[in-house]
């Protein structure tokens, strides 16, 4: 345990996570994606541009090759990858930039790969949330597989409030792939002043840094994640001059060393000068484990003895972090694509490696597109059970059939806990 000053928490806990219903609101529309083409009629890009609350379903499965980054800027949207026929939906060749509020993203894979120019590679994330001209809020990213970024696999940009990032795979961020700063490989960045961020039950595998990294000014709950083969950092922090005080609860994360892991890695790395630069920070640590390293670096930073953040009611993490993450994380846990299956197998065997190029691990295996019209229930936006709409109950059943874990929004035979606002 760190040789740190422990003080009492000074504020009431913040609730972390989002209770949004996305596009599943009365008066919404169902939009069918019918082609893997980058653009045009029936494409995902066209669906993103549609106005008004919407649930996007997929009548096609396979790989969408993006000609450029794809951006969602319309609020109240659900991207329901669980509706796609096997092998599901994978985006490649560009980043997904989410710049809208009240959004749910589920059961897709985003694997951009390197671009041809340093200018593009410098911001080649798999998924970016926020970062536009206005703040965004209330976003759930669940059962999404992110890999092969040149910058961050997941970037939660400035001015983002209430995020649930749950049961995802964040893996194999590329190390020497043309980033203008040189060697990279970054898992997840939580930027300054992001509030109420919950990072729960995810697999971080074979990322050199940022598994995740948390900036001063954020309020974040990072718990019950498995971090496998981190290169030089697992969970760590960085200072941003002038930002508001940091609030962080780092709970029950497990770090498993791999072939690329630095011998001195701790589960949580806190800068030794945190107490001087961010004197009002509230950092709570509990139950974090690192094999074979220590849980936390030794230093003069300040901790608190009560968590400054709590999860939304009803989020019940698995009792065994490793088993739960390997069971539930990723786009289609019961029907994994070749990339996720390989990553999970390597983590189980302790052989996962940080890579420079997707070709080192076989790249994407593509077959012909698959087709199956999504059987959306009639009166999809009419009331269903447990305070949900019919379309929500249907999506929950589709997700759990693919291996999604029960959640406040999708209880398994129980009462919905995230009530409609």
Residue ranges, per PLM feature:
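Gram-negative bacterial Sec-dependent N-terminal signal peptides
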Residues: 1-11
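Acidic Gly/Asp/Thr-rich repetitive segments characteristic of extracellular carbohydrate-active
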Residues: 18-56
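Detector for repetitive beta-architecture
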Residues: 30, 41, 53-55, 61-63, ...
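Acidic glycine-/aspartate-rich tracts in secreted/extracellular proteins
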Residues: 37-39, 61-63, 83-86, 258-261, ...
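Right-handed parallel beta-helix
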Residues: 64-198
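A structural signal for beta-strand register positions
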Residues: 78, 83, 109, 145, ...
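Extracellular beta-rich repeat passengers
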Residues: 214-375, 379, 396
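C-terminal non-catalytic accessory extensions
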Residues: 354-421
